[in-house]
Structure formats: structure tokens, C-alpha cells
Amino acid sequence: MAEKKMWGGRFKQGTATLVEEYTESVSYDRALYAQDIAGSMAHARMLARQGVLTAEEAAIIVDGLATVRSEIEAGSFVWRREFEDVHMNIENRLTELVGDVGKKLHTGRSRNDQVALDFRLFVSDRVRVWRELGRDLVGVIVDQARQHTATLLPGCTHMQPAQPVSLAQHLLAYAWMLRRDIDRLEDCDKRARVCPLGAAALAGTTYPLDPASVADELGMYGTFRNSMDAVSDRDFVLEALFDGSVIMAHLSRLCEEFILWANPAFGYIFLPDAYATGSSIMPQKKNPDVAELMRGKTGRVYGALTTMLTTVKGLPMTYNRDLQEDKEPFIDADRTVSASLEIMAGMLREVRFNTARMRTALRSGFLNATELADYLVGKGIPFREAHHLTGAAVALAEEKGVTLEELPLEDYRGICDRIDEDVYPILEPEAAVSRRETPGGTGPRSVAAQIAELDSWLGR
């Protein structure tokens, strides 16, 4: 077995079968094949420019790598466990195709800087997908908000009725969360897409390499300043997983609200059939399983972040085999984040809002109490006293089983003689919403400004 290993020259005994099974990574890092081939092509061209390879040798290698890529994409490539990982599988097949010239590809390069390059490109590529899926979801949210600027519902704190808000304002809160997420992803991409080539195993190389030209060819933002940092750094994975975790936290919050709102106790939404499931025993059930699963899958992404933090927390310089464990958590998290963003966009696009039920809910919970307190402030009463007087009015209305709009004027005047007939229009939900035109508030002009700003950001 030892002679089959590309590193096996000093070994007399082959790798134990169980060890081979335990240490292989090709079963999952084959996902990086496109980045590995792109990096190797750029490396070969650079070697030719630097006079390490001839132009003819580089062309043969690049053509051979293109053939390997075609085989992989056609499904005819045979992945072999004994070659351990994506890099050695591709290099072995390249050598089968082009002969000994293929063995020159690895000149000036170690798997340490090779895998760092591949994984940086892979994470960057996937983060860019998350970014575009996030932008698509923001667009869906903005479109829904545009249709519901006049739809009002109870805004809550502590899951208790607090103040009336527009449904548009409620939805736009998630758009702004996702915009921050996308900003973070753009920052992450800049730090991930940095070229580590030239570091070799850890100390650099004696060959006259030009990593900057490789970085340019691969659309990277620069090169590393320290070879030891280049091969050992996995900050970019941590950052991407943190960003993915925050995205999932935001999606999970929206899922939680959809789950609650779909319950007849709220009845605010009608879930589309395509995003719900039924019960094997209860024929009437329409379960929000998609939202529940997305809420549950959030933990998988958190787990991936925790796995990576634990993996790197005690590693001495420089590369350690522990770092092989960086790919599975990210690949799993990527599947979850990508699918969740796309599915949430589809679900939100098709969900129907029960605006009549939302309107009815505005009559419970004294959501206009703050309006009464502000009204009293306008009559010259200090806010703390106005707060106390409003509390007394709420208690009286609750005792009588009426809303603040229904409380008779004589009862109001028994609490404060400055209250007059002009209090009643102020207590209407539309009045409460329309008066809140502070920047970012739920007032119509503020909501319209938010929609316009997000439309501009989306390039509409």
C-alpha cells in the first residue's frame, strides 16, 4: 500500500485499512473539485510565467486538468479512497492522462497551502451564493411590505400586545436584519478570498513564485504576508459560520412568528399548501413543518460554528491534521443556509395574510394606551403623571369590559378633567400609526422611505 501513496517514499509498511477509512476526506472534500482545479490551473500558468515549467508543460497540465473536470462533471470520474483527498485524486488522474509532466504540477506547492487556497475559494463562492439568496429574500419581503403599508396589527413586546404597527413595518424589520447579514457576508468574502500560495508547507519555497498573479487570475483580493499564518488560518471559516448562524437566527425568528401566526389562536396567516404538511391520523391538520424544521435546523449551523471553534482553539503552529475537520461542518452548514434562504423566499412569496383577523386583534390589549398618555402630555401633564393616569383609565376600562375608545367621556373626566372629546380620534389605530413618523418609525412616510431605500439598495 505504501508505494501507492504520493508521500509514501519513506514508508515500508502500508496504511492500515481502518486508518485509511478513518483519515480519508475525499468522501466530502470532493465538493471542492472546481476550486482545486481552478487553483491548479492558475498555479501551472504561473509556474510557466516564472520559468519553472515550460509553456508547453503548463499547457499540457491545464488541458489535462480540464479533462479531469469534464470527467467529474459527467460523473465518470472514479474517486479512490486510497488517494485520501480531492487533491491527490485529481493529481493522480492528471498523471494518468498526461504522464510524468503531471507530476510537475505540485512544484513549489504543499497540500497545506493548496487546501487553504481551495477552501478559501470554496467558502468565498458559497458566501457569495448566500449573499445573492439573501438579496432575493429581501426583495420578496419588500414586495410583501409594499402591499401591506395600510395593514395594521398588534406590535408586541414580551409577546404581549404593545402598540399598533403596520404589517409592512413588521416585515421590513426582517429586511433590515438580512441587509446587515449581507453586509457581513461581503466583509467575510474580502477576508476569505486571499491567496495563500507560496507558503508551501509553512516556511515558503525556494522557487521564484508569484502568488499575486495567481490571486489576480482567481479574482482574489490579495496575498498573505506571513507563510505560517497562510497555512494555519481558518478565521475565514469561523467568520462564515458565524455569519450563517446569524442568518439562521433571523430566519428562525421569522419561522417562530409564522408558526404562531398560523395557529388559529392568532390566525394571522394562511400557509401555502406547498410549504405545509398534514397528519397521519388527524385529517384536519395543516402543520407548519417547513418553518418548524428551519427553526430546528438552525441548531445544525450553530453546531458547525461550535465544532470549528473547538477544532482551532488549541492548535499550535502551523498546519495540523485537525484542520481536515473544517470542511464537513461548513459543507453541512452551507446546505442548510442556502436551502433555508431559498425556501423562506418561496414561502413568504406565497403566504396569505389574514388582514381582517389582524384588524380584530387590534381591539384587544389596550394597544392605544400610549396614545392616551401622549395626549395627556399634550395637555400639559408631565409624562410620568400621564402614565399613571392612563394606567388608571386602562384599569377602569378593563373593569367595565370596554376598550379605551369605548370608555365614556365622564369616566375619563373622572380620572383627569383635561380630557375632552378630542381624545377619541387619537385613540384610533390608524391615528396611532400615522403619528409615528420618526426616522424608522411605523408611520406611512417612514415606511415608504424604508421601502424606497431598500429598493435602491436592491438596484430596482
From Swiss-Prot:
Pathway the protein takes part in: Amino-acid biosynthesis; L-arginine biosynthesis; L-arginine from L-ornithine and carbamoyl phosphate: step 3/3
Domain of life (superkingdom): Bacteria
InterPro entries on file: Arg_succ_lyase_C, Argininosuccinate_lyase, Fumarase/histidase_N, Fumarate_lyase_CS, Fumarate_lyase_fam, Fumarate_lyase_N, L-Aspartase-like
PROSITE patterns: FUMARATE_LYASES
Localization terms from the record: Cytoplasm
Alphabetic keyword roster: Amino-acid biosynthesis, Arginine biosynthesis, Cytoplasm, Lyase
EC number: 4.3.2.1
Main location: cytoplasm
PANTHER family: ARGININOSUCCINATE LYASE
Descriptive protein name: Argininosuccinate lyase
Protein source organism: Nitratidesulfovibrio vulgaris (strain ATCC 29579 / DSM 644 / CCUG 34227 / NCIMB 8303 / VKM B-1760 / Hildenborough)
Lineage, highest ranks first: Bacteria, Pseudomonadati, Thermodesulfobacteriota, Desulfovibrionia, Desulfovibrionales
